[in-house]
């Protein structure tokens, strides 16, 4: 049976407290870019459900930027490698790969003529490099700053200039080509986190962890003035110019974004983003009519200049690895749980999603299952918890388990939830434990067959065990040998087949109820 990719429900940007991230804007105004792990995510601004993922980096990617023409993207990773790749073809054909220095790349900027690229970061031998995009040939030297450089930008008009913002609290100014050190600006008292030219190049702005934002002349680099006094109560992570250059957006660790008039450097409006630590704002982008910000939680907010107290839209999801996935009874909703304990519900047709609220596990989840009006989850906090679907929040129902659960399955007619745990198999009925069966192996997963009242349990001892449910007790029926630790198992929707996979990437299909092998193959994945 042929299959094809229908939708990509993309990850959120990977964030880290105290670290700004960089959003890349499409010069055509259609898409925006960010990174997570080894991937670059391209998302449509109007419809974020339309997404593409570039996965050719071999280590975590820190930043990606479109060329001014929009035909190429340059992405830089933790090892100091730059990949320049095509945006037109779905295959994203690699044009060039360079290694400007050894160490994390933190920011990238293209010259307006698409010919030159400047990259900055935390190299072992230098903190920045400027080179030709076509050949990799050096076109100058980025020097004069004594600590890692966090941000850079090319002046989008002639005469070309490059500006850099460093952890030595200075702004570097370079003239060229070939680019040579011209001066440093020392108005900041803490790390400079962002430097950006206005769209015309007449001005540039800088932002730092001292909470200050300064505006400079784009040609002479003379200080024009300070924005606010200071601009924020916390560190400023990023700035973004309005396309006409008349307004400036700043985002801060004080959990606000602020909009400033460039000419008067006075506050126009403030966008309060919340009160929790996760509401710190670590990046922003002004793309046409859209104003985007990213919070420490990874949520992407579309700001409304006419109503600063409420965003137009908030894109939610996960920015940590997804460890569990389940479907609603009617298969219209997907439930996912991640490494940090967050649970998200997704509309399976269009990707619209929301984060489940309430007191959850707070750490890695190992199982999730939908049943009627509720979703049940288990995690490494050794508990079974309940989510009310209508309220989209956790309830107060919590069942404490004797050891860590690894899988969850439900016998609906019997009103029983089965949990395969590290040291035992536990049955729960009406939110209380009714049976526990000690086991001599470490269970990894389980699946319930309501027609035969059987529970399949995968173990690390290379066996798949089938238990019979009688009332509220379990009895061992049979053992099925595998060549490696069984990692997952699942019954087919009609309960006529059971599939199991193991650590050796073997997938075995059994016929129920005799559990005779129907199919044996080697898979590319070990999850079912």
Annotate each language-model stretch with its function.
Residues 99, 122-124, 186-191, 200, ...:
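WD40 beta-propeller repeat blades
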Residues 40-44, 82-87, 128-132, 171-175, ...:
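WD40-repeat beta-propellers
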Residues 36, 76-79, 120-124, 164-168, ...:
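Conserved strand-to-loop turn within each blade of WD40 beta-propeller repeats
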Residues 1-46, 122, 126-127, 290-301, ...:
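Intrinsically disordered, low-complexity acidic/Ser/Thr/Pro-rich linker and tail segments
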Residues 17-24, 59-66, 102-110, 147-154, ...:
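Canonical WD40 repeat/beta-propeller blade segments in eukaryotic WD-repeat proteins
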């Amino acid at each position: 049976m042929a299959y094809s990719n229908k939708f990509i429900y993309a990850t959120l940007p990977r964030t880290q407290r105290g670290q700004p991230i960089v959003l890349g804007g499409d010069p055509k105004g259609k898409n925006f870019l960010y990174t997570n792990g080894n991937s670059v995510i391209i998302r449509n601004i109007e419809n974020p459900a339309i997404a593409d993922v570039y996965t050719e980096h071999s280590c975590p990617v820190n930043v990606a930027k479109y060329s001014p023409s929009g035909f190429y993207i340059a992405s830089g990773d933790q090892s100091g490698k730059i990949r320049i790749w095509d945006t037109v073809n779905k295959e994203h054909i690699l044009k060039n790969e360079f290694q400007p220095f050894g160490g994390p790349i933190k920011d990238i900027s293209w010259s307006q003529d698409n010919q030159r690229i400047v990259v900055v970061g935390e190299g072992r031998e230098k903190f920045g490099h400027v080179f030709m995009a076509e050949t990799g040939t050096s076109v100058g030297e980025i020097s004069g700053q004594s600590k890692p450089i966090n941000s850079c930008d090319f002046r989008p008009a002639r005469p070309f200039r490059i500006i850099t913002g460093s952890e030595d609290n200075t702004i570097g100014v370079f003239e060229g080509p070939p680019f040579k050190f011209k001066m440093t600006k020392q108005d900041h008292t803490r790390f400079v986190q962002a430097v950006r030219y206005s769209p015309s190049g007449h001005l540039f702005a800088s932002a730092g962890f001292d909470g200050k934002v300064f505006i400079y002349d784009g040609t002479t680099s003379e200080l024009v003035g300070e924005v606010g006094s200071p601009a924020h109560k916390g560190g400023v992570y990023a700035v973004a110019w309005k396309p006409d250059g008349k307004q400036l957006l700043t985002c801060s660790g004080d959990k606000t974004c602020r909009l400033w008039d460039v000419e008067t450097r006075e506050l126009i409006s403030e966008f309060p983003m919340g009160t929790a630590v996760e509401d710190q704002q670590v990046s922003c982008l002004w793309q046409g009519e859209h104003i985007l910000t990213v919070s420490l939680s990874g949520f992407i907010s579309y700001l409304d200049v006419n109503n600063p107290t409420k965003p137009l839209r908030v894109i939610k999801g996960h920015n940590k690895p997804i460890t569990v996935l389940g479907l609603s009874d009617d298969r219209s909703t997907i439930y996912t749980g991640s490494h940090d304990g967050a649970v998200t519900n997704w509309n399976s047709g269009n990707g619209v999603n929301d984060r489940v609220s309430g007191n959850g596990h707070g750490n890695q989840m190992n199982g999730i299952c939908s049943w009627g009006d509720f979703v049940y989850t288990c995690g490494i906090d050794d508990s079974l918890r309940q989510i009310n679907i209508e309220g989209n929040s956790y309830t107060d129902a919590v069942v404490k388990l004797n050891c860590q659960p690894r899988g969850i399955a439900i016998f609906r007619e019997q009103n029983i939830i089965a949990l395969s745990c590290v040291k035992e198999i536990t049955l729960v009925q009406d939110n209380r434990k009714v049976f526990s069966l000690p086991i001599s192996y470490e269970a990894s997963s389980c699946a319930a067959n309501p027609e035969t009242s059987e529970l399949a349990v995968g173990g690390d001892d290379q066996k798949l065990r089938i238990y019979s449910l009688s009332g509220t007790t379990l009895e061992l029926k049979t053992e099925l040998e595998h060549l490696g630790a069984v990692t997952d198992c699942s019954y087919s929707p009609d309960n006529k087949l059971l599939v199991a996979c193991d650590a050796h990437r073997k997938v075995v299909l059994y016929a129920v109820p005799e559990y005779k092998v129907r199919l044996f193959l080697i898979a590319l994945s070990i999850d079912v």
